[in-house]
């Protein structure tokens, strides 16, 4: 069975759906999480972040909404660049400006079609602006920024920067990224209870789900699952490559290896700047291959425990704990680092194969 199949697109909701088969649940959840938090996209900083101030300068505003609300609303405006433009984008290369004064005798709407912009100090054409700030397909309206009464004036300038949803939700490329288990109708027919029917999904011999429906609603009309899924797999691969590099470094500042509570044959890896996404993928792969399937490392070494923990939800810190048996020196960290590094390499190979299958599927179907 193909890993990806049955792509559909619902235009009113902009929802892309497709089925995923026989891919580890942790990898699918990792793709979902990375799409939501780790894909860099251009946008406007509409509120103070940890390392950034708002990228909006209010020149004149004597309307009903005060500056903080206007800046926040501007920060939520999607910047719809194309895939190659997103990848190559450098901070502040696009500058936008809006200057509207109500000289009529009635209240007017100020919308994104009033915005002008420059790219590298060259004016962006009106047609391109309509693509960057598109109207709603159903209502044909542009995004409402504010309303001005007679004599009121709004003038602002803003810089477009590239950040991720981890920095702020306004840099989230999607409004929806989730998955569900596909029900097995033969098993569901055997159940009388509605909840039992919902639990009757396709499973492997361990009871894990193996068929999924993945849904993505993209905010930017120029990018969709073809770009987002590929990008998320690249990011996960890069995270694993970076971890491998740190494991090989004797002077690593991001990975600390130490024996866990003086328990012989158990070491923990304290990893900075990582979270559940990577931890769950590594844990799931090692558990499936060494504990469930009882495979050996270097033909004789058994893994008896693999687990991870992120001690605090607001701190990017992950701890992986591994127990190995039949090691020549259970107090040496080298064999544990080698074990984790080799498994990272195997996961990278698997993710690369998945990406190739996804690319072929996307070319033919999306």
Q: Model-derived features: where do they sit?
A:
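Protein-protein interaction/assembly regions in multi-subunit complexes
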Residues: 1-366
């Amino acid at each position: 069975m193909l890993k990806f199949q049955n792509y559909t697109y619902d235009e009113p909701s902009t929802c892309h759906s497709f089925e995923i088969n026989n891919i580890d649940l942790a990898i699918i959840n990792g793709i979902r999480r990375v799409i939501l938090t780790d894909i860099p996209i251009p946008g406007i900083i509409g509120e103070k972040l940890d390392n950034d101030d708002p990228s909006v300068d209010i020149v004149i505003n004597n309307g009903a909404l005060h500056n903080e609300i206007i800046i926040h609303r501007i920060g939520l405006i999607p910047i719809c660049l194309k895939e190659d433009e997103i990848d190559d984008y450098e901070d502040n290369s696009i500058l936008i400006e809006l200057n509207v004064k109500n000289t009529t005798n009635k209240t007017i709407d100020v919308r994104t079609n009033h915005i002008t912009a420059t790219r590298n100090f060259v004016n962006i054409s009106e047609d391109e602006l309509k693509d960057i700030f598109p109207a709603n397909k159903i209502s044909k309206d542009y995004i409402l920024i504010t309303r001005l009464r007679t004599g009121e004036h709004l003038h602002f300038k803003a810089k477009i920067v590239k950040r991720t949803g981890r920095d702020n939700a306004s840099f989230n490329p999607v409004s929806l990224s989730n998955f569900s288990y596909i029900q097995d109708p033969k098993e569901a027919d055997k159940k009388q209870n509605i909840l039992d029917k919902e639990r009757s999904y396709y499973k492997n011999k361990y009871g894990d789900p193996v068929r999924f429906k993945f849904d993505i609603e993209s905010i930017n009309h120029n990018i969709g699952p073809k770009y987002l899924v590929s990008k998320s797999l690249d990011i996960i691969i890069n995270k694993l490559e970076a971890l491998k590099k740190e494991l090989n470094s004797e002077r690593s500042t991001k990975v600390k290896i130490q024996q866990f509570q003086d328990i012989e044959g158990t070491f923990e890896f304290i990893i900075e700047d990582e979270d559940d996404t990577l931890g769950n993928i590594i844990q799931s792969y090692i558990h499936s291959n060494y504990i469930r399937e009882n495979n050996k490392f270097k033909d004789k070494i058994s893994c008896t425990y693999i687990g991870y923990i992120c001690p605090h939800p607001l701190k990017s810190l992950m701890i992986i704990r591994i127990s190995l048996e039949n090691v020549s020196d259970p107090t040496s960290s080298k064999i544990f680092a080698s074990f984790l590094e080799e498994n990272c390499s195997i996961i990278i190979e698997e993710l690369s194969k998945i990406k190739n299958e996804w690319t072929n599927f996307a070319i033919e179907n999306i």
